[in-house]
Regions:
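N-terminal beta-strand motif that seeds the catalytic metal site of vicinal oxygen chelate
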Residues: 1-16, 72-77, 128-136
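Residue-level marker for the onset of beta-strands and adjacent loop->beta junctions
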Residues: 5, 36, 73, 99, ...
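Core segments of cupin and vicinal oxygen chelate
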Residues: 8-56
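Membrane-topology and secretion signals of cell-surface/extracellular proteins
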Residues: 24, 66-68, 124-129
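Short beta-strand/turn micro-motifs at beta-sheet edges
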Residues: 60-65
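Mid-chain, well-packed structural core segment of small domains
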Residues: 73-90, 96-100
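Vicinal oxygen chelate
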Residues: 89-136
């Protein structure tokens, strides 16, 4: 069986979150999307389940973190180019997200990120394997 990853994130407003991520170019699997959750397709075998906070709470006995006040997780996605990193951040900002940090350029690796409408941090990274420094 092929492994899949489902990142589950608590959200406040389903339609607003779906509109935000649609503006970034993501699609949703209607088979696993309803008023309680939306299955966002990131790539083959990689998904984010955007879950209404009340529904998310049914999966844990711990309090649900307020992602606008504390960091619960950093979701990191690879990109095919520096331009793709910048374009996705641009789309996130245009859709109402924020960029909590400046881009970081390490020569062999370039990264930038955004916070979505619920405060979840999404890091985007492009790496140039040919430029990775050799191990000492």
């Amino acid at each position: 069986m092929t492994r899949q990853i489902f990142v589950n994130l608590a959200i406040e407003n389903m339609e607003r979150s779906k509109a935000f991520f649609s503006a970034l170019g993501f699609s949703f699997n209607p088979q696993f999307t309803n008023d309680k959750g939306a299955c966002m397709v990131i790539a083959d075998n990689i998904y984010a389940m955007l879950l209404a906070e009340s529904f998310f709470q049914t999966f844990t006995k711990k309090p649900v973190a307020d992602a606008t006040k504390s960091t619960e997780v950093l979701v990191c996605l690879s990109c095919d180019s520096r331009a793709e990193v910048d374009e996705m951040v641009r789309k996130a900002l245009a859709a109402g997200g924020t960029a909590p940090n400046a881009p970081q350029d390490h020569g062999f690796m370039y990264s930038h990120g955004f916070e979505d409408l619920d405060g979840h941090v999404w890091e985007l990274v492009w790496m140039d394997p040919a430029a990775v420094p050799p191990q000492a």
